[in-house]
């Protein structure tokens, strides 16, 4: 299971052959806007214009790529299967079933909030797996920190974009963006997998 619904404003539409890449700007209840990278076939986008409000249905996907620094990076995006009319409010709802593929990172923020970073491997049928970053707060952070590698979980939340500061040894500070599922609900399920990752 890997399903996401996004409703918001489409922008930065780029067509390359039969592939279309674009960004969905989705407003939270707080007013903050998440900018989510999306990809679809040109036949799905039809005549969608920059600035148009739409609803997208698809899956959270990830792919590794080599950056300018020659290091491997993880791209998180939404593979859009269906585009429908906008229904009057922004939406960002995701449900993913998968396995914890590396040990959870439980810690406290500088403001003393509990936080837990996880990577969930979600099987894509015969096409391999997507390795999806997730972040949990407070009580969810404490509970998810107790998961073991290979344990099956169902996660509900939103796909968010979050800016953070990357500090290098030479003192340079770079603003970067993380894309991850912010967990609002989770449960364990009977699946488990040995040697995940």
Q: What name fits each language-model region?
A:
Residues 1-197:
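Single-stranded nucleic acid-binding surfaces, predominantly the OB-fold ssDNA-binding core
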């Amino acid at each position: 299971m890997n399903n996401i619904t996004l409703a918001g404003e489409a922008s930065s539409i780029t067509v390359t052959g039969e592939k279309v890449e674009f960004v969905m700007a989705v407003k939270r209840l707080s007013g903050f806007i998440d900018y989510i990278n999306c990809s679809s076939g040109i036949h799905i986008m039809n005549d969608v214009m920059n600035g148009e409000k739409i609803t997208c249905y698809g899956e959270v996907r990830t792919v590794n790529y080599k950056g300018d620094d020659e290091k491997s990076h993880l791209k998180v995006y939404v593979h859009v299967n269906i585009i429908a009319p906008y229904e009057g409010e922004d939406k960002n709802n995701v449900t993913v079933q998968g396995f914890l593929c590396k040990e959870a990172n439980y810690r406290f923020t500088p403001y003393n909030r509990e936080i837990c970073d996880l990577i969930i491997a979600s099987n894509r049928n015969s096409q391999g797996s997507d390795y999806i970053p997730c972040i949990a707060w407070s009580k969810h952070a404490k509970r998810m920190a107790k998961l073991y590698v290979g344990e099956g979980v169902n996660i509900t939340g939103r796909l968010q974009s979050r800016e953070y500061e990357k500090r290098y040894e030479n003192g340079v500070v770079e603003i970067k963006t993380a894309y991850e599922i912010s967990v609002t609900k989770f449960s364990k399920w009977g699946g488990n997998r040995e040697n995940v990752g």
